Each structure stands twice: as structure tokens, then as C-alpha cells.
């Protein structure tokens, strides 16, 4: 049958969608564009913000509009945390954030029987990591490897622990198998992803940590570049940096989750570190790596945030000098502790986000400018009208005038800043 899939949200969702696509293709089904007519649609939903909830509902309605007679199936965090609301949308099959193989079995049954099914477990009771086939999309150079699921940090603003459950880790032997498979398929870069990869190994009870996993991936992956997902500051210790520095394929791009640069706000968020510990991580990364790209997330207008507290955050992000930032006005998540706190007006949240974005853009342009004159091994991913486009190890996009470089790594000398990226010239080998 013909199946259209739409994915919202994080890299974990993208990874799980790719795993479903592989399995559907193996079962003989045809994947079609989501806007095309299909026998069934899958919406892999997100619930990290209210906007994510809204987009999830919109895509469910769009699927029903695209082909009124098609089976519409939804999975993911929005369905997991908003079961009754999702049921009201007239979805034929609802499953949450677990058991993708059974989800596809149920989808095939629903197409045959036209029976409505809702099968959503209690995420907080999960104890086993669901191993899915690793891989990437056809013609892609970069593959994702999901090594961890779940989170037990329970930040006061976040609904994800309720959507994903406790920490579960991909066993090291399974990780080795998947890395070898990706290497044999010709991928040039592997993105290590999970809901909270800093907690990798906590459930394995044998002392295994994220750096142990990275050393294994480097050993099994050969020349495949390793790119990390989001890290918590506690991960970045001197031992971590000393061992990571010895991995030649590890990209010097570190997304270090921050959320606020004010200690009082961090305490209300239950973030379990302060700005001093965060900055220690920033300094360690810069001590061990040559001008690494340190990126982060920021929430503006968190409940009870004063102008003075926000001013502390602005000063702190300037001190850190991030290469790039993801900035979000605070979004109320019903059922979280922050939802019961005194709320900051939305106009203030958005105004603070705009002010922070201006600082972030200035820092981003400064980081790009520091790249000019340097040479980087660039992994090229696509051809465009202006030439080939890829990413340097620090994840800055690089364009060269030459075409036909897809899935190759070329040394490129950076000659100029080009908007939000870089322009360069391939060096002779």
C-alpha cells in the first residue's frame, strides 16, 4: 500500500521515522509524499511546546483532508501525553512513543479491518531500550544512531519525561553492530542521538558512560565522523575532554544545554547546575579543542523571570560566546510544575527572545568570521545552483563553486562569510 509520513520534532523522532520507513519498505509498501493520495498516513508527533501540539493536530487534520478514505495513524510525544485530545481528532490508530514494530503491525491491520485502535502504555513504567534498525535516508551522507531514550531530570517546564519514560540505553554490543552496519552502507557521518544522551549507561549498571560509547563508535566506525547530540554540563569533565580529544573522528561541535544564564531561574527550572558549573564546561571544551562550536538552547520569559534576571542571562551568553543558539519563548506545558508558577506575559517572553536573538546573531557572525582563512575537511551533502554544499566538522555550512561532490570529504579553505554560512575553495590534494 501507499503510505505518507510526516515527522515533527527532534532528531529522535526523525530517527524513529527512518526506522519505520525502512521496515515499511522491507514489508513491500510504497512511501509517498505526505501531500499525495495514500492508503495510510503516519504522523510522528511532538509535544515539546504548545506550538508543537498545534502543528501535530494540524498535520493530523491535513492527512484526513488529503485522502478522506485513508487510515490515519499517529504516534509520538503528543499522542503519548494528550491521549484523550488526540482521540477527539478522529485518528484511526493511536500509539505513543514505544514499540514501533507493533505500531506498523497495527497499521496494516487497521487498513484491512478499518477498526479504530488506541494502544498507549504508561511511559514511566518502561525499562527496556527498543532497538530499532540504524540508518539514514536514501542518498544522505549522515546517519543517526539512537543510543538512549527517556529522561529522569524532571525539569519543571518539561513534559518529555512523561512522554518518554525513564532512561534506557542501547547496549554496547548492539551499538557496535549498528555502527558497523552504517559504515558498510557508506555513511560518512554518524549523529549520536537520544532524549538525554548524557545519561547513557545509567541503566546498564556496569559503569558504562557516554565517553565509553564514543570510544567504541570511533573504533568501529573507521573514518566515519561522529557528531554529538545535546549534552548536559555535567558530562563535560576533564576526564571526558581528555578522552574525547583522542578521538580523531569526533566533531568539535558541542551543543551544551543551558536554558538560562541566571542561577535563580535555573533553580526554578530544576536544572541541577549553576552558571559557574556551566561555564566550567565551556572553558574545558575550549581548552581541549581548537575553537570548537559551542551551541545552546535558551528559554526566555520563564515563570517569575524578572528583567534583572534576564539581564544576567544576556550577560552570561555574551561571556560564553556561543557559535549558535536556539531561542524559545517559554511555552506552558500543562501538568508541569512551571505551569503553576506566576507566568510572564507572552509579549515580554517574545520581546526577550528577540533581544537574545540579536546577541546570538552577533556572536554567530563573529564565529563565522573567525573561520575565514582556515581550512576544514568538509563533508558535502548536496548540489545547489551555486555549487556543492556541506558542513565543516564544527557544523558550519560551507559552499564551494564546484558541483558533483556529494558524499565526499574535501579540504576547503574558507574565503568568506556567506550569510549564515561560509564560502570557500577546495584545496588541491
Description of each model-found segment:
Residues 138-141, 151-152, 250, 260, ...:
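Short flexible coil/turn linkers enriched for glycine and charged/polar residues
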Residues 72-73, 81, 184-307, 318:
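Conserved SAM/AdoMet-binding glycine-rich loop
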Residues 340-429:
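Terminal RNA-binding accessory module
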Residues 175, 192, 228, 256, ...:
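Conserved, mostly hydrophobic/aromatic
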Residues 1-200, 239, 250, 254, ...:
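Proteins enriched for Cys/Gly/acidic motifs involved in redox and nucleic-acid/cofactor modification
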Residues 47-48, 164-165, 204-207, 267-273, ...:
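Short glycine-enriched, charge-decorated loop/helix-capping segments at active-site entrances
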Residues 101, 153, 165, 198, ...:
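Glycine-centered loop/turn positions within well-structured domains
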Residues 7, 230, 258-260, 380, ...:
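Flexible glycine-/small-residue-rich
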